[in-house]
Amino acid sequence: MRRILPILVLALGLSGCQMTSVPATVPARVEPVAVTPKRLPSRVEEVIGERENPRVVAEFGGVYRNPQVEAALVKVVSRLVAASDDPSRHYKVTILNSPVANAFALPGGYLYITRGLLALTNDSSELAAVLSHEIAHVIANHAVARARVIEQADIVEKVASDVLSDPVAQQSARLRSRVTVARFSQDQEVEADRIGIMIAGRAGFDPFAASRFLDSLEHYAEFRSATGSRDEPKSFLASHPTALERRELALRAARQFGAPGTTPGDRNSYLAALDGLVYGDDPGEGFVRGREYLHPRLSIRFSVPEPYRLENTKEAVLAAAGPNTAMRFDGVPVPADTSPSDYLASGWVNGLVDGSIRETTANGLPAATAEARAGDWFFRIGAVRVGSSMYRMIFADRSSDEAIAAALDETLASFRRLTPQDSARLRPLTIEVVDVKPGDTVASLAARMQGTDRRLELFRLLNGLGEQDVVSPGEKVKLVLE
């Protein structure tokens, strides 16, 4: 598999990564919510932001429109800007239509937050903690500074490659340059945390919300992880400090404003603005419902067995069952008379095991399976043709092919067409804010959640509740419902 297998192996290596803030330079039209300026920033920053903004918006699913949430954002940003050291800056805030929890900034005052991250916030102070961190990146010119450091590192690597004849010396020079970039990025994150907490505290928000929300993000990373591990080893090449380091530094900065619990909360009024927020996948990209994937436009569905966890992306549907086992599902156009077995034998699979192709069916649809080996990886591949589309299921495991053989068979057996009635009934998930009534418990409220097979975990995550926390009558909580 010239492209698919290396990509899948790379995805396994990156499965534990999560960014909460990046100086973005990635890929339309956008009309961001604006905070009225007194003075524009430098033209250089403005040009960079204007150039990169359309690519960022396109990469993250476009702009998500929600007047209630936009009003809440403008209110929070206005207070933060007024409390910053440069209240004359102009900021443009965009909600991105992405289910992934992320926020970042571009030079020129472009601030971005995904609807996936908004779903995790539980009061305006937590939202302020996110936005003040990104405002700090803008004020400190972090994106431009980091670009210069990366450029210098690239020069070092090129010199090492062109001038040094000793491979060990070349590798040492490259490693030193990468460590320099990583340490610089970590320092930027710590500085943005410190500046952001100072801004939020001066604006009257709870300064301890930053450490609280960092904990929520760590729980979010755990929830998304197939292994459920929160004990990721710290890499000296990581661009962010560890969550524990950031929480400790955030608490230290917050204590300058006093003790925790002295800032009035606004949970109930804030959650009212999130009522109706789309949660999870965009309808145009299909839906993940627990271990099931459904695409109303393509009229297909399939499910994966335990313990696989599905993730929908623009390029493919991915699943993982631990650090060394994964699945990728995608589709490619083919002539309508192409058989799945001929397609598997057409040369796109590197390491195809001779004689391993087997013809079969998937609920009446023509299908075929095959085996492949690449290095120390085992692969089981399935192909199903629906009209002029060939859908591919690629399972990979680093130790054995027995488990993935069974997983492929089960997934292939679940693949079928959706009827027009099935497709019409599919609706996106939304955040619904409800009042806790007498007799309600965490367990009873979580049981009402839809679209997930991990209801209790997701309910606690969305509402910022620990394992021992309870709910009280009169408070508001978030549910995920169709």
Name each model-derived stretch.
Residues 2-6, 17-295, 304, 309, ...:
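A Zn2+-metalloprotease active-site environment signal
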Residues 93, 101, 111-112, 327, ...:
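Surface-exposed aromatic
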Residues 128, 306-310, 393-430:
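Surface-exposed amphipathic alpha-helical segments
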Residues 328, 345-394:
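Signature of long, low-cysteine stretches enriched in small and polar/charged residues
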Residues 454-482:
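Extracellular LysM carbohydrate-binding repeats and other cell-envelope/extracellular binding modules
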